[in-house]
């Protein structure tokens, strides 16, 4: 596995390939080339001073006679935790708020309309430890918790929709915990929330020790800038999860994540891009950065030695379009903001071209899936009938 010193696939290719070969490799890896955004000089300067990467790209679409371009800019934020996990909870939250506020200010300079933060962005990703305290103290109300109020101020100040994934404390239902994304309108009002539908039990990802599968289905949020959905982390491995957000009308699906190199880095460039193609929508995959060390050792249930960290979060956030093209990723080892301009008309244009929704045969799969979930289901496997088999000789 590549270590944190290896910055990005893009940098490696650009360093070692001749220009003509590089162009062909990028054509295959990334599809139709995206346009570089001309970002404001003051934004680039602020990002440099605040020590985070700032990149900008744009997807185009064919000009139409009856519809104006539907242009929206999204901002994906990837970041490491600024304080040690042993620091007091309130101090860690405050430091993360400060870091995100600085990045959001730069996003506003770049004209971002919708900004999305990484999974459980206001805390360390401590679910590997299986310890309850102090990690459950990071949980907040989705409706009026400290982090939601902070994001409401950002949204109103910058006229920006905010997608804020947090550890939710549901006080209306016994104080249970959920892995939740809060969606805040550019007016500053909480539009609603969505919860992680699929919970991993893989290696150190011991999340079901804290929360279970979400119970809110696949809501899509009609914002001023387009219809958005949030497929949290592990849900990207489940094609039907993406499909249901698309069926409910999502034009942009965010995938805020916390995933490590040894487990999933080879899958990362494929899954969100696949989903964009299959569902005629834009997908936005973002991941945290760095290595988080915890005070107490924990084990993985694999016979290996106890350790203090989950692994290396490899960043590499990117956006994929319905035509299969994608942006280059942010780096593997640096905080960053990826600004991407989308023309939502491309969703319908690609739908008309490939017609996956028309040819999807949902009624057939609905019927067969309804049978498959029954306890007495018998798989439709055709076997050779030995009685009717022709005799030899």
Swiss-Prot record:
GO biological process: beta-alanine biosynthetic process via 3-ureidopropionate; CMP catabolic process; dCMP catabolic process; dTMP catabolic process; dUMP catabolic process; in utero embryonic development; liver development; protein homooligomerization
Enzyme Commission code: 3.5.1.6
Gene3D superfamilies: Carbon-nitrogen hydrolase
Active-site positions on this chain: 119 (proton acceptor), 196 (proton donor), 233 (nucleophile)
Pathway: Amino-acid biosynthesis; beta-alanine biosynthesis
Alphabetical keyword list: Allosteric enzyme, Cytoplasm, Hydrolase, Phosphoprotein
Reaction(s) this enzyme catalyzes, per UniProt: 3-(carbamoylamino)propanoate + H2O + 2 H(+) = beta-alanine + NH4(+) + CO2; 3-(carbamoylamino)-2-methylpropanoate + H2O + 2 H(+) = (R)-3-amino-2-methylpropanoate + NH4(+) + CO2
Keyword Transmembrane among UniProt keywords: no
Keyword Disulfide bond: no
SUPFAM superfamilies noted in UniProt: Carbon-nitrogen hydrolase
Protein's cellular compartments: Cytoplasm
Domain CN hydrolase: 72-344
Stored InterPro entries: Aliph_Amidase/BUP, C-N_Hydrolase, C-N_Hydrolase_sf
Any one annotated GO CC term: cytosol
Location of Phosphoserine modifications: 378
Any GO molecular function: protein homodimerization activity
Function: Catalyzes a late step in pyrimidine degradation. Converts N-carbamoyl-beta-alanine (3-ureidopropanoate) into beta-alanine, ammonia and carbon dioxide. Likewise, converts N-carbamoyl-beta-aminoisobutyrate (3-ureidoisobutyrate) into beta-aminoisobutyrate, ammonia and carbon dioxide.
Family: Belongs to the carbon-nitrogen hydrolase superfamily. BUP family.
PANTHER family named among the record's database cross-references: BETA-UREIDOPROPIONASE, NITRILASE C965.09-RELATED
Subunit structure: Homodimer, homotetramer, homooctamer; can also form higher homooligomers.
Protein name in the entry: Beta-ureidopropionase
Source organism of this protein record: Mus musculus (Mouse)
Lineage: Eukaryota, Metazoa, Chordata, Craniata, Vertebrata
């Amino acid at each position: 596995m590549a270590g944190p010193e290896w910055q990005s696939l893009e940098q490696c290719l650009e360093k070692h390939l001749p220009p003509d070969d590089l162009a062909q490799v990028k054509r295959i890896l990334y599809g139709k080339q995206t346009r570089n955004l001309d970002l404001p000089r003051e934004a680039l300067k602020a990002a440099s001073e605040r020590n985070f990467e700032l990149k900008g790209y744009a997807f185009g679409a064919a000009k139409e006679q009856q519809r104006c371009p539907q242009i929206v800019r999204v901002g994906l934020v990837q970041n490491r935790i600024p304080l040690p996990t042993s620091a007091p909870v309130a101090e860690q939250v405050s430091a993360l708020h400060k870091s995100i506020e600085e990045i959001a200010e730069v996003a506003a300079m770049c004209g971002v309309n919708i900004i999305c933060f990484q999974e459980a962005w206001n805390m360390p990703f401590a679910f590997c430890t299986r310890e309850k305290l102090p990690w459950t103290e990071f949980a907040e109300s989705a409706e009026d918790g400290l982090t939601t109020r902070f994001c409401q101020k950002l949204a109103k100040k910058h006229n920006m929709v905010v997608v804020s994934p947090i550890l939710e404390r549901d006080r209306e239902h016994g104080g249970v915990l959920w892995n939740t994304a809060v969606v805040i309108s550019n007016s500053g009002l909480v539009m609603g929330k969505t919860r992680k539908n699929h919970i991993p039990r893989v290696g150190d990802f011991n999340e079901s020790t804290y929360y279970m599968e979400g119970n809110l289905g696949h809501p899509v949020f009609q914002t001023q800038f387009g219809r958005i959905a949030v497929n949290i982390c592990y849900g990207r491995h489940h094609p039907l999860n993406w499909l249901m957000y698309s069926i409910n009308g999502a034009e942009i699906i965010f995938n805020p994540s916390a995933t490590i190199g040894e487990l999933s880095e080879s899958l990362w460039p494929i899954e969100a891009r696949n989903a964009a193609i299959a569902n005629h929508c834009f997908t936005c995959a973002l991941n945290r950065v760095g290595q988080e060390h915890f005070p107490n050792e924990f084990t993985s249930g694999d016979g290996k030695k106890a350790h203090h960290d989950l692994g290396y979060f490899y960043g590499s956030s990117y956006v994929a379009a319905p035509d299969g093209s994608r942006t280059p990723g942010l780096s593997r080892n640096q905080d960053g903001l990826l600004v991407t301009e989308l023309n939502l008309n491309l969703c319908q244009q690609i739908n008309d071209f490939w017609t996956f929704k028309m040819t999807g045969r949902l009624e057939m799969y609905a019927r067969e899936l309804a049978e498959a979930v029954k306890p007495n289901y018998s798989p439709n496997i055709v076997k050779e009938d030995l009685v009717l088999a022709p005799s030899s000789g």
